[in-house]
Amino acid sequence: MTADVPNARLVDVELDESIGRSTPDVEHERAVAIFDLIEENSFHPVGDQKGGPYRLKLSLMESRLIFSITRENGDAVATHILSLTPLRRVVRDYFMICESYYQAIRSATPSKIEAIDMGRRGLHNEGSQTLQARLKGKIEVDFDTARRLFTLVCVLHWRG
């Protein structure tokens, strides 16, 4: 349990820069998600007794999501590689609803925007729960941390 481990949190998050940059909107989402994640998170690699704080590098390679975890001083802690297959549908649906949302905020009624946003939040929650389940036994995260990590997974997809 993260409460028993000192400094079970992230102090730095980096996305694989080799994928390249995306649109200003996506880059803004990335920056906000990283800021929010660093400000408040619960993150503990299972089996690590020394505790954090931790640095995380997220990258994509051959349809796999790679979590490279080090201590604040750079010492390696763990690398976890997850298949993206369980997340593909929800990420695809999330992209589609985000596109609808961005179009709606330009011309739709407030009630239509609110309805689309509720659907977007629901899909975001679903993706967060799926990611949290995929990390179980590897990295302990709370739901809010999983939500912010899911946002970053989506940013990697947008860029990749």
Swiss-Prot record:
Q: Which domain of life is it from?
A: Bacteria
Pfam families given in the database record: UPF0262 (PF06793)
Give the similarity note.
Belongs to the UPF0262 family.
Protein name as catalogued: UPF0262 protein BCAN_A0255
The scientific name of the source species is Brucella canis (strain ATCC 23365 / NCTC 10854 / RM-666)
